[in-house]
């Protein structure tokens, strides 16, 4: 595979260093790799271009949202696809994955309180056809990773929230962070 060959010792070291400190200076990174800053920059840019890494701000969710939930959903194929389409851009969701086993879909989300999780479950999941079973596990502490790629972006269109629902739609989550305040 080309990707495996591309991830040589130097590229793995770059990934390791950027994981520890995404703001490391190229001169410092170059010293750790024993290469020139230009060579380090070229390698970082190639890793980004090949979509192996992405450099962005991560957020400590506990500073904003004290609760998190892991939601397991058992649904038919249509129900699973509906939920994926609805939640793909939800700012509260930080992990969404199709699975095999007891659940067809796993959702990890953050919330400010239990009522926000209940609203989310009732409006975004339980209301959809094809949902057979929903299992929720609550957490008040995310241990690893401590920082997450939460998406606090306002919707591009002021009439719609990030998930595609209208701002005035009764089905949207009342505390959606994508609504401009």
Residue positions per predicted region:
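A compositional/biophysical signature of low hydrophobicity enriched in polar/charged and small residues
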Residues: 1-181
């Amino acid at each position: 595979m080309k990707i495996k060959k591309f991830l040589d010792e130097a590229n793995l070291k770059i990934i390791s260093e950027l994981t520890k400190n995404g703001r490391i200076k190229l001169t410092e990174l170059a010293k750790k790799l024993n290469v020139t800053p230009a060579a380090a920059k070229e390698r970082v840019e190639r890793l980004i271009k090949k979509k192996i890494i992405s450099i962005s701000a991560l957020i400590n969710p506990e500073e904003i949202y004290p609760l998190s939930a892991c939601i397991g959903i058992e649904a038919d194929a249509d129900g699973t696809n509906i939920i994926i389409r609805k939640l793909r851009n939800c700012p509260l969701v930080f992990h969404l994955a199709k699975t095999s086993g007891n659940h067809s879909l796993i959702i990890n989300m953050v919330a400010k309180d239990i009522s926000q999780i209940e609203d989310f479950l009732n409006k975004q999941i339980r209301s959809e056809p094809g949902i057979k079973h929903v299992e929720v596990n609550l957490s008040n502490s995310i241990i690893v990773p401590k920082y997450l790629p939460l998406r606090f972006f306002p919707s591009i269109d002021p009439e719609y929230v990030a998930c595609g629902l209208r701002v005035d739609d009764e089905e949207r989550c009342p505390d959606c962070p994508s609504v401009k305040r």
